[in-house]
Every structure is written in C-alpha cells, then in structure tokens.
UniProtKB/Swiss-Prot annotation:
Name of the protein: Putative ion-transport protein YfeO
Transmembrane portions of the chain: 15-37, 57-79, 99-118, 149-171, 186-208, 221-243, 258-280, 301-323, 343-363, 376-398
Annotated keywords: Cell membrane, Ion channel, Ion transport, Membrane, Transmembrane, Transmembrane helix, Transport
Record InterPro entries: Chloride_channel_YfeO, Cl-channel_core, ClC, ClC-type_chloride_channel
Gene: yfeO
Membrane topology: Multi-pass membrane protein
Entry GO CC: plasma membrane
Organism: Shigella flexneri
Family under the similarity heading: Belongs to the chloride channel (TC 2.A.49) family.
Subcellular location: Cell membrane
SS bond list: none
MF terms in GO: chloride transmembrane transporter activity; monoatomic ion channel activity
Keyword Protein biosynthesis: no
Amino acid sequence: MLHPRARTMLLLSLPAVAIGIASSLILIVVMKIASVLQNLLWQRLPGTLGIAQDSPLWIIGVLTLTGIAVGLVIRFSQGHAGPDPACEPLIGAPVPPSALPRLIVALILGLAGGVSLGPEHPIMTVNIALAVAIGARLLPRVNRMEWTILASAGTIGALFGTPVAAALIFSQTLNGSSEVPLWDRLFAPLMAAAAGALTTGLFFHPHFSLPIAHYGQMEMTDILSGAIVAAIAIAAGMVAVWCLPRLHAMMNQMKNPVLVLGIGGFILGILGVIGGPVSLFKGLDEMQQMVANQAFSTSDYFLLAVIKLAALVVAAASGFRGGRIFPAVFVGVALGLMLHEHVPAVPAAITVSCAILGIVLVVTRDGWLSLFMAAVVVPNTTLLPLLCIVMLPAWLLLAGKPMMMVNRPKQQPPHDNV
C-alpha cells in the first residue's frame, strides 16, 4: 500500500500530465503556424515578386506592416491581446481567457514578421490562463496557484525540451518553510514538465547547443576570464535595462497602439537592414547561422550583439507580444564570439557560456535558468564548475539593481497597456 504522502503526490499526477501535454501542443501549433507564415513572408512572396529576401525595402516593409498588424489586433480586440510583456514577469497572474485568441494572433504575427522576441512569455500566459480556467471548473478545490505552477512547469519543459529547467527554477520558488519535503512539492510540476518535454520531443527537438571547440581542463585564469566576460555581458544588459522603461514611456505617449507598433516595426526594420537577416526573429536558429559563418569578424559580432540588444529593447518597449530570453541568448553568443575573436587565448566555450550566463541573468534575474541556458548552449561538463563559480560575482554585481521590466502606471487597468 502506498504511504499517504505518495497518495497525496499522485492526486495531481493526471492533471499534471494533461497540462504538460496540452502546454506542448499549444506551443507546437503556434510555432508551426508562425513557421508557415514566416516562409510565406520571407521566402515565397519575395521570390514570387522577384525581390531579394535581404532587400532593405522588404525588411523595413515587412516589419513595419507587422507592427501595424499587431497594433490593430491589440487596439481592436477584447482584452487588448493580453498584458504588455514589458510590464510582466515570465510567470504572471492568469489573464481572462477572452484575451487569449488575439494574444496568440499577435504572437504569431510577431514571430513570423521577424520581431526580435521569443514565444516564451505569451505561450506561458496562454497556458496559465487555460489551466486556471479549466482546472477551476474540473477540480475547484485545487487553488489557482497550483494550476499556475503546473502550467508554468509544463510550458518550461515544452520550451526547452527537458524537465531539468523546470526542476531548477521551481526548486527555489517552492522551497518555503513548509514541513512538506521539497521533492513532494516538486513531484507534480516535474510530471507536467516531463510530459511537456516528451510531447515536444515527439514533433521536434529544440536545438540549443552550438558547435564550439571542446573545453578541456579548467585553469585558475579561466575563472578570472569568465568573470570578466560575465561582467561585460551584465554591463551591456544593464544598458538595455536603463533604456527599456524610458523608451517604453516615450513610445506610449502616443497612446494609439497601431501608431506605436507601426513606428516600432519601422525602427526594427532599420535595425534589421543594418544587422542583416541573421539579426531578425527570435534568435535560436540565427545563432546557429552566426556560428556557422566563418566570415564574421570581431566588428561583425559586436555589431550583431548591439543590433540584437537594441531590437530587443525596441520590440519590448513598443508592445510586441513576445519573450526576452531567446533573443538575449543570441546577444550572449554574439558577445562571446566577439570576445573570443578579440582575445583568442580565452577559449570560445568560456566566452560564449559566460556571456550567456551574464546577459540571461540580467533579463531573468534567475540564477538557475541562467546556468541552464549557458550549459545547454555550450554543453560541456568541464564548464559546469566554472559557471557555478562565475555566477557568484555576477550575482553580486546585480544585487539590488533594477530588473528588465517596466513598472506599470497605476492609472492604467491591468491589461489595457500597449
């Protein structure tokens, strides 16, 4: 017979598995539709019209029209296509289900149109809202926070193709003063994360790792080098943190979402022309292209890092629906490659992984997620002790610093912001 503790853990097992599978399927469907639309906008349509895909006019035109389209969705839809991601953490309060269809449309348009944001925040918002709404009907005695945690875990597992990230993140958020053991509380979220990851794996495998030269043995000087790289990435990220609320306030003085997002799309188009096609979109596929291109120089990597970081700030400040983690990883890779080209004596594995750690830490302020992203992009077990050590001065540098998020004006209702 099972112990009462085991029976308690099993109570939410089936709902957790169902939520994990559903979270993954929603992500897969959204990404597939966005991929088809992206292929139409950036491959078939310019080919049919006889226009080069990297034509400046095409890049500016598509991104400007994308901004206008997203602005129309936000302006004229019930719920204004969900909350403004610039004002929200990755895991937030559930939104009304009526806002979800337009939020999904706004996300798909942004992903397909080349906006420098990832899918993580809107997908998280959708999955949390659905889990809370449906869960409250089916099992009303389970509180909203439980459904929120399960949906968040399932989404994280689906996004990264592994439950490890969810285990790391929730090991700190669920580790309170309760007498219930931590792993008892982690059981259902990990079930959701595992179900989400396995479901994603049936359709495609998220490919984060980069073909970077293997790192052999850790030296004492490598720790210093890694700490310096992380500090440089943090400094770059904090410039973006300073710019975001100011640009957000300036853009939102125009009040009209169509105008704000149209101008934002136009600026993104100009940045895309300067950085080239590799600086567009969420950044995961593009960072693979960046590493594969042997022709890039130190100045090219620097330009890509600056352009992508600027595009991330502009997209977030304008009100595009999307997440900041994936483009931040691209910025970290570009910074790391630039620093390796500038100082070849420091292995690329160190510069890239530590730059990712630093920039993702600025964006998320989550040490475990930052370590996870650095470790999966540069998968080398020899790096793990170094990354853990480098995390310490990086965390000290960011202690008490503002987060990459905009404080919502008090006079505005929760979900009416652009």
